[in-house]
Amino acid sequence: MSTSRSDALKAEADRSDNDVEKLLRPQSLDEFVGQEKIKENLNVFMKAALQRGETLDHVLLSGPPGLGKTTLAHIIANEMGARIRTSSGPVLEKPADIAGVLTNLEEGDLLFIDEIHRLSSVVEEYLYSAMEDYRIDIVIDQGPNARTVQIDLPPFTMVGATTRKGLLTAPLRARFGIDFRYDYYTADLLQEITQRSARILDVETTPDGAYEIARRSRGTPRVANRLLRRTRDFAEVEGDGEITKAIADRALNALDVDEEGLDDMDARILLTLIDNFDGGPTGLKNLAVSVGEESGTLEEVYEPYLIQEGFMERTPQGRVALQRAYDHFDRSSPAADQDLFDQE
């Protein structure tokens, strides 16, 4: 297959996956499964703002990727009857970029900035007055002819999403009146999400088939929906189209997703810690180089779940594998080896 043909097929597949993700995305708080505390509080805040005829206060959504931050931003826009404008931290490189976005907002609009922790400090400073006073100051010309022009903005709602809240500066965090942190989902909630997605995709699933996908989805709806789509492929090719527990187990094993929901990279991280670094501690950069992945990806995508589930921990000295990791891969821990040595 030619490179151009391969690239074209990949682009088409990416578009298809994006279309499916949009199709599966809940459109209202009632459709949104899980994160009950966030939903309850947000419902109150939105109703109060609507009753007062005001825009909703600025909202910060933080937590690991794939838990529904972007989805909730769109739901807020739907519930508030607002137009949503979307961007991301890496795209807004210069003051002119953010100024262009802000000056095109209309009253009541919702501006969603994903990966807001990746905004440059210069761009971030423009947001301070925009969020607090609904105005920005733009410098016209250069040198002795330079002058500042103040532009008033209509009231709007900023929704920022981040996987690394700690990287946000204190002044920016302080300008968000509503601050929510996402938790990982339970297997039962993910089963509910999986069954809802299956109905939308017109895929037959048994309850235990949906649960098998759910419990091996790293507590993450995005992962559950992705595994559902891939399991559907196995059900159609190797079965009668219905996702049963047996089909789900077959598909997930073929995708290198083990009984604990760990994928190939999870295993590489933990086994590298155990085998190459004697369980740790070792630094993030050393670990990233050893497994061939970006340190930021390890820290944002993989480590939160492994830490949450007790496979590893972060210490001041570095990353350390915990006993559950040794047990999972049937390895003997240094502590167990020492106990055995002491008994001899």
Curated annotation (Swiss-Prot):
Residue numbers spanned by region Small ATPAse domain (RuvB-S): 186-256
Identification of the protein by name: Holliday junction branch migration complex subunit RuvB
Catalytic activity entry: ATP + H2O = ADP + phosphate + H(+)
Keywords, alphabetical: ATP-binding, Cytoplasm, DNA damage, DNA recombination, DNA repair, DNA-binding, Hydrolase, Nucleotide-binding
GO cellular component: cytoplasm; Holliday junction resolvase complex
UniProt subcellular location: Cytoplasm
Residues engaged in binding ATP: 24-25, 66, 69-71, 132-134, 175, 185, 222
Enzyme class of the recorded protein, top EC level: hydrolase
Organism: Salinibacter ruber (strain DSM 13855 / M31)
